[in-house]
Every structure is written in structure tokens, then in C-alpha cells.
């Protein structure tokens, strides 16, 4: 099934006549029910409640997955916000370029160093693709992922600060980080004195002792840099910069 899907997607990408039709089908037909919902558990609605409706904010979404489905910035985009969407899946970025052309959409794997890493790849448009072997254990145990479903690929990582600097993104209203266990590497690469980030939503899953330790470090970094936990929604933790007030 995976090989058939991959062959189909490769065919679509190489044939412009089919490519746009597939993008339209994926967003507006197959995933039509998500066009009004935005985020999966209401994270986006909660974030937007801190801003006046007229505010046109800036966001950064790392591990953006899909432009509409279970996306924490889609309603922001529809409200006039603009941002940078980053994902290591090329098809994801193709869909963003189709559905959200006013955003900056980048195909990249983000980490704390620029180096070659192993990507545990399941499929295009799959939330289970990960750079972390420990997170792969979680996927196998909790999502019944089989070894034969996983391909090991080499991928070159990029640093987030280089991307932010290239687009002059120093003042950010909302940052979403959902990278399947690689969140600590990204947070470690952020200079919180240089980049003003008002809200950070980060996925944290305590699936084993190593993951718990990593999540403790995530909390320590955010607390040390002036953030408090504002709300927990499912596996997503929303942190707010202390002394932040509603913005016009």
C-alpha cells in the first residue's frame, strides 16, 4: 500500500496537470471538514483570545504537517496573520504553497546544528516521520508501527535562527513546535534575548523515562527564559511570556 501511494505521489509531482488537481482534492475535498476547524483541540482559538480581532500577527510553525488539517495557524492565516511554515516533508510544503501562498513555506528539517541526520520516514503527509529513535519507540508501541513501514533516510538539518534571520523574524506572536520528539533540539537553538516570542505551543509526550527527562528540560528552558505554562491541551503545552498583555 505504501509503495503504491508513493508511486502515485511521484507521478502526480511530475505531471503538472495532475499536481494542482491533487492539491485541490487533498485540501478542499478529502479534508474539507477541517476548513473551518483549524487546530485539533482548540489551541488556535485559545491563542487568538489574547489578541484583538484586528491584530495581524506573525507566527512560526515548525512541523506544520498540513495547511488546514489539525493546523494551529490556519485560522490565524484566514484572519490576516502571516508566518513561516517549516516541515521536512516536501509534499507538505507543496500543499502550503498551494493553499497558503501568502505565507513563507520552507521544506527543511530543523535542529540545533547543521548536520546529516537519520530520518525515520514512514510516508509523505505522515505525522509519524521523526528524527528521534526514542520517539520511534513510542510510535511502534502506541501506533503499532511496524519495522517494514519505516525507511531510514539521510537528511541535512538546518538551524532555525538562520531561517528567522533571513526573513527578519525577530518579533513573533506565536510559535508552534511539533516535531515528533525533536523539540528540545529546536528550543536549545533559540536565542530568547534576540527573538521575542509571545506564545509557544509545544508537544510533549511522557511515553518513557527518556521522554520525561527531555520534557523536564523543555520546561526548565522556558521557565528560565521567562515563560509560564498558560494551558495544557491534550499533549500540547501552551506557554506565555511573562508580563505579556493583550496586543492591539
Description of each model-found segment:
Residues 1-248:
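Phosphate/nucleotide-binding beta-alpha loop and adjacent structural elements of enzyme active sites
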Amino acid at each position: 500500500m505504501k509503495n503504491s501511494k508513493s508511486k502515485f505521489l511521484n507521478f502526480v509531482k511530475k505531471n503538472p496537470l495532475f499536481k494542482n488537481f491533487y492539491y485541490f482534492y487533498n485540501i478542499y475535498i478529502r479534508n474539507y471538514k477541517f476548513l473551518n476547524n483549524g487546530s485539533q483541540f482548540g489551541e488556535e482559538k485559545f491563542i487568538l483570545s489574547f489578541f484583538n480581532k484586528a491584530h495581524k500577527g506573525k507566527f512560526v510553525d515548525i512541523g506544520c504537517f498540513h495547511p488546514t488539517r489539525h493546523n494551529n495557524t490556519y485560522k490565524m492565516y484566514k484572519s490576516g496573520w502571516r508566518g513561516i511554515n517549516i516541515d521536512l516533508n516536501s509534499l507538505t510544503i507543496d500543499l502550503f504553497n498551494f493553499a497558503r501562498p501568502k505565507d513563507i513555506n520552507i521544506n527543511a528539517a530543523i535542529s540545533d546544528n547543521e548536520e546529516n541526520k537519520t530520518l525515520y520516514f514512514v510516508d509523505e503527509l505522515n505525522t509519524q516521520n521523526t528524527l528521534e529513535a526514542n520517539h520511534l519507540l513510542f510510535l511502534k508501541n502506541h501506533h503499532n508501527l511496524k519495522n517494514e513501514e519505516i525507511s531510514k533516510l539521510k537528511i541535512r538539518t538546518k538551524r532555525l535562527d538562520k531561517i528567522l534571520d533571513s526573513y527578519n523574524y525577530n518579533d513573533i506572536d506565536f510559535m508552534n513546535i511539533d516535531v515528533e520528539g525533536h523539540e528540545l533540539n529546536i528550543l536549545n537553538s533559540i536565542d530568547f534575548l534576540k527573538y521575542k516570542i509571545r506564545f509557544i505551543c509545544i508537544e510533549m509526550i511522557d511515553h518513557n523515562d527518556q521522554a520525561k527527562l527531555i520534557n523536564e528540560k523543555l520546561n526548565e528552558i522556558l521557565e528560565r527564559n521567562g515563560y509560564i505554562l498558560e494551558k495544557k491541551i491534550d499533549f500540547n503545552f501552551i506557554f506565555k511570556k511573562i508580563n505579556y498583555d493583550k496586543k492591539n
